[in-house]
A protein has these predicted regions:
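N-terminal secretory signal peptides and thylakoid transit peptides that target proteins
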Residues: 1-11
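N-terminal Rossmann-like dinucleotide-binding module
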Residues: 16-80
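Beta-strand-loop-alpha-helix segment that lines the small-molecule cofactor/substrate pocket
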Residues: 105, 112-176
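Short acidic-hydrophobic, aromatic-tinged amphipathic segments that line or gate anion-handling sites
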Residues: 84-92
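Conserved acidic residues
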Residues: 61, 100-103
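Active-site-proximal beta-strand/loop segments in catalytic clefts of secreted hydrolases
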Residues: 26-30, 64-68, 108-110, 149-152, ...
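Structured segments of extracytoplasmic/periplasmic soluble domains
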Residues: 33, 42-49, 95, 108, ...
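Short amphipathic alpha-helix with an adjacent loop that forms part of the alpha/beta core around
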Residues: 92-99
């Protein structure tokens, strides 16, 4: 058994052994007070509103980060909660099995070092990440719900394509 396969066993065991939904978290970068912290950390630790605690309803089973921030917390949280930080979106969605192995995808593409266009819009790779998600869905012959933080893309054409893929492959898509 290769080291990588061995290190994926805790996430696979967690996913296989519970009736809870398994979520792949895809992030551009993950640090305190980032959008990834606001979303992914709540899926790990739950959250409080007023005096009521809301436990996480599902399990994060993999994390992909496009960039590692100098004050990264993604690696520490992955280690603490027992899921792998992977090097590709495909690995995050397949857990190393070669087929779709999660029940949902969180796409958090906000923050990080990305270029700006002539309108001073930061070109976060939401479309590019989403395209890789879709490739896994197509290869697997099935799809799962996707949540995309913020709007879909800075480009109308790219946003429309993302919407069209969700209709074509019949998966729920939420953004906001």
């Amino acid at each position: 058994m290769r080291r990588r396969s061995f290190l994926q066993l805790p996430a696979a065991a967690l996913a296989a052994g519970s009736g809870r939904k398994r979520i792949a978290a895809l992030s551009t970068t993950y640090h305190v007070r980032s959008h990834s912290d606001n979303f992914i950390t709540r899926f790990l630790e739950g959250y409080w509103i007023d005096d009521r605690y809301y436990p996480p309803p599902c399990d994060i089973v993999s994390l992909y980060m496009d960039q590692v921030h100098p004050a990264d917390i993604g690696n520490r949280l992955a280690s603490a909660y027992g899921f792998p930080v992977v090097k590709s979106i495909e690995q995050a969605l397949t857990l190393g099995t070669g087929k779709l192995a999660v029940d949902g995808v969180l796409q958090i593409a906000e923050h990080g070092n990305y270029p700006f266009n002539d309108r001073q819009q930061q070109l976060y790779p939401r479309y590019e990440i989403f395209e890789q998600i879709v490739k896994v869905f197509q290869k697997s012959g099935r799809s799962v719900p996707v949540f995309s933080d913020k709007h879909l893309s800075w480009s109308w054409t790219k946003a429309k394509q993302m919407y069209d893929w969700s209709n074509e492959l019949k998966f729920p898509l939420m953004a906001g």
